[in-house]
Amino acid sequence: MSTADVLVVGAGVAGLAAALAARDAGARVTVLDAHAGASALAGGAWDVASDPAASPEDVFRPTRTLREALLTRARDDVHHPYAKLGAGLVEAVRASHARVLAALAIYRPLDLDGHGVLLATDLGLPRRAATAQHAILDLGESPHDGIWVGVFPGPRQGESHFVAASLADLAAHAGDSRRFEALPITPAAHASDTLPHPHERAASADTDAGLARLLDALGASLGGRREGALLVPAMLGVTRDDVAARLRAHLGIAVGEVVAPLAGPQGLRLVRRIDTALREAGCARRSARVRAIEPRSSGTTVTLEDGETLRGKAVILATGKHTSGGLVVRGGELVEPLAGLPVVVDGRVLLLASSSAGRDTAALFGTSPFRASPASRAGVATDDAHLALDRDGRPRAPDLYACGALL
């Protein structure tokens, strides 16, 4: 049996937030995770009230602050977890992000009275986010400058040309004064630099020799330019956090990465910093897969794959949604697999399909990549204390909580 007061299932950003809050309250915390989840696939930025339908004009020249976007989301979607926080929404988001971002130590602080960070994605699209890793370039810091997009020889070099052309076109369409132009980068000759991938360049930048070669290559390619900014692929280190700052100090211009939304150096940095933050907070870690969670009126039991059972004063599900397995499709049904909690969409329990063939997954996930599907809004319902609810809207157990994307 566990000696922890709190068992957190999942070690992504939500699991970190839950663990830190419990530790700050004086609890003994054990975090259970068997593998990297969705956070490992995350890019180097996240939002608090994103608008995927925002036009380039809205992105380059936003009119709403993050605070206003938060309040609008809570007002317009009464089933969103934000709506449960009522008048305390803004302060709750501010305080929780301040704690988590400080613990991670590689992200910009959250400014709810601002417009967030203006980023470029590796798909050549401008995006606003609430915060981003320091290694990522904030285009908002160069409102009237030329921005060079570094093109490195090797696999995927054509993508950088596309990013430069796409950003230039979208900025012009939005009437923005920033100018984007591709800049070929010629790395210093080195045997191990033969057509490396961006993640290999990122690992190379972790070494003093690799960073020195990168400094030389960028300096030579810039040719003494001290105006504007330099946008590069996600390659500014994995295990060290000062690469971007060193480049900026040496070159005299802003240098930063595009946001890469799939697995890569930015996700690896986040996972590394989560591990460090949990350790520094005094949380115990168990690399163990949870087989089942049994909610009872007398308390919740967690059973590991090896048969060991754990109990605590509280169990917090921070298992994510579809990508990390917090919700799965079984027999055509969308289910929460560990505790058997009902799945809710827009405040209503997702009823079981009556057909023996199960549910049409297209009805759950949709057929258009540009529209939110019911499954994207699906999750576990909680009460105002974040206790997970059963099909009748009552707490499933007195000590079983849920948080994060699982909601």
Indicate residue ranges for each PLM-predicted region.
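Core beta-strand elements of the Rossmann-like FAD/NAD(P) dinucleotide-binding domain
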Residues: 2-4, 306-314, 396
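N-terminal Rossmann-like FAD-binding beta1-loop-alpha1 element of flavoenzymes
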Residues: 4-31
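Conserved N-terminal glycine-rich FAD pyrophosphate-binding loop of Rossmann-like flavoproteins
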Residues: 34-73, 189-201
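Dinucleotide-binding Rossmann-like beta1-alpha1 core, especially the glycine-rich loop
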Residues: 48-152, 163-169
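Helical element adjacent to the flavin cofactor pocket in flavoenzyme catalytic cores
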Residues: 164-170, 208-229, 236-291
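Flavin (primarily FAD) binding-site architecture
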Residues: 317-334
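Short FAD-binding loop at a beta-strand-to-alpha-helix junction that anchors the flavin cofactor
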Residues: 391-407
